[in-house]
Amino acid sequence: MSLLQFSGLFVVWLLCTLFIATLTWFEFRRVRFNFNVFFSLLFLLTFFFGFPLTSVLVFRFDVGVAPPEILLQALLSAGCFYAVYYVTYKTRLRKRVADAPRRPLFTMNRVETNLTWVILMGIALVSVGIFFMHNGFLLFRLNSYSQIFSSEVSGVALKRFFYFFIPAMLVVYFLRQDSKAWLFFLVSTVAFGLLTYMIVGGTRANIIIAFAIFLFIGIIRGWISLWMLAAAGVLGIVGMFWLALKRYGMNVSGDEAFYTFLYLTRDTFSPWENLALLLQNYDNIDFQGLAPIVRDFYVFIPSWLWPGRPSMVLNSANYFTWEVLNNHSGLAISPTLIGSLVVMGGALFIPLGAIVVGLIIKWFDWLYELGNRETNRYKAAILHSFCFGAIFNMIVLAREGLDSFVSRVVFFIVVFGACLMIAKLLYWLFESAGLIHKRTKSSLRTQVEG
């Protein structure tokens, strides 16, 4: 890449970054937080944060990258995607009418809410316990990170339930919403994330998500400033780099350490070059249609229920890894959101996917606003826990693609909804057995006087 070509790419990158950052800043000033703000920051991180890192790798370490015209296509496709997404998100689908009293779809009380978070936490802890009994601490047993996907590791399906510890702790926080509950959320979820990091063998997702939710709650409540958020972001990047070194068993120093930091940080937070690789091989892609979305559900079907279930699932990430990169190491390489759309339907699917994503984020913000307006604090805690708990799925959306997002968000909704139903059933059983007694002011006064 020549300096002239880099200059042209830099101008396009700067314009796209300023365009998205400006719209995000205006939205932040208006509402302080919603899921449009979160997705916009996530989109910036995924598709634009990596460009400066790539530039340093090219000019400082002479690393090979896709041709400049392909990198230009990647930047422009990301910018156009966001423009279509933003218009869709801001388009009002129906006229605003005065809020008329409507019968709520469901309601919650204190006992049901506490039962819900206990069940969610129980699912996570039991899953971790069973996985640990089968495999021990994989971080200290395996020689390479790719081995966690091999037949040596049993009970891999249990990892999908680990994440429900975070929604459980979110319910606990939203029931109190003070600084002590906020700090308890951070300590409990990060400790759990470090535990799963050691047990699973290097998975950092729970740590990243817990830290991100902690920061956004702090921004919403005014407990941290934007400068503190930026400092925490830098600290998070350094922390993820250190965990990546431990995961891959790397011991580096000097120029090698700087080089490793650049490419690991780029691959962790901003795999935008993967989109460029897909565009570079555009003519060789056999468009998959909506099949990757259907196939991604296969991993949630137990083999005893479907004996003939394919052992290898050809979703967009695996198609990109196996068919485009010809990589059969056992690791699935992230195609990014736009890359998954390219795999499914080429350039035509990019604006269509942007419209779909705009509607998805609009739906999450609608739920979030319902929680903000809810007068029943127990129901509000459940709604907010669901919305913030889905942040993991939004990260999957930006990094892994639409197909991975759909299967995971459906799984999240089913498990979360099942926990709600079980909590309500248990409450009904306890109440029928006479074990539930409503609190009254007189009984509370008697307890205090006694």
Swiss-Prot record:
GO cellular component, one term: plasma membrane
GO BP annotation list: enterobacterial common antigen biosynthetic process
Transmembrane regions listed in the UniProt entry: 6-26, 37-57, 63-83, 118-138, 155-175, 181-201, 207-227, 228-248, 341-361, 378-398, 410-430
Primary site of residence: membrane
Compartment list: Cell inner membrane
Role noted for this protein: Probably involved in the polymerization of enterobacterial common antigen (ECA) trisaccharide repeat units.
Name of this chain's protein: Probable ECA polymerase
Native species: Escherichia coli O1:K1 / APEC
Gene: wzyE
